[in-house]
C-alpha cells in the first residue's frame, strides 16, 4: 500500500469541476498518478463527503454518476482507525480539522500509504504525507 494514493474530496471536486480554481492542477496530478500506475483509493468517509460536496457544487446528476461509477476503490475505515483519528483531534486542539480529515490521516498511517491527492491545506498542516495537488 506504500505506493497507493488517497484521493481527498477536494481533489475529486477540482477534477470534475472545470470552473474550479484548482482544476488544471487536478488534471495534471491525476495524469501523474495514472502515468505512475499508482493504486488509488478513497475511504468510505471521503466517499460520503465527496458525494455531498458534488451534490452541493455540481448538482445531483453529477453527484449520483460519480457515486455509482466513480471508479475508485472504497477502503472501509476500521474501528481502530476511527479511535486513532479521535486521538489525533485530541492532541491537535488548535486545528480546525474535520473528522474526515483526521480519519484520512489515521488510514494513511495505519495502512502505510504515504501520498494524498488533495487541495486541503489541513493535510500539509499535519505534515506526514507527500501531497499531490497543493502548491508548496
What are these regions (language model features)?
Residues 9, 101-102:
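Conserved glycosyltransferase catalytic-site signature
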Amino acid at each position: 500500500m506504500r505506493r497507493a494514493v488517497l484521493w481527498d474530496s477536494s481533489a475529486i471536486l477540482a477534477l470534475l469541476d472545470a470552473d474550479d480554481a484548482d482544476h488544471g492542477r487536478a488534471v495534471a496530478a491525476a495524469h501523474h498518478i495514472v502515468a505512475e500506475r499508482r493504486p488509488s483509493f478513497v475511504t468510505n468517509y471521503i466517499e460520503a463527503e465527496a458525494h455531498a460536496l458534488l451534490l452541493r457544487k455540481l448538482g445531483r446528476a453529477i453527484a449520483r454518476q460519480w457515486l455509482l461509477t466513480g471508479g475508485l476503490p472504497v477502503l472501509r475505515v476500521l474501528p481502530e482507525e476511527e479511535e486513532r483519528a479521535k486521538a489525533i483531534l485530541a492532541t491537535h486542539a488548535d486545528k480546525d480539522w474535520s473528522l474526515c480529515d483526521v480519519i484520512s490521516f489515521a488510514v494513511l498511517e495505519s495502512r502505510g500509504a504515504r501520498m494524498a491527492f488533495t487541495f486541503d491545506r489541513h493535510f500539509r498542516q499535519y505534515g506526514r504525507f507527500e501531497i499531490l495537488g497543493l502548491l508548496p
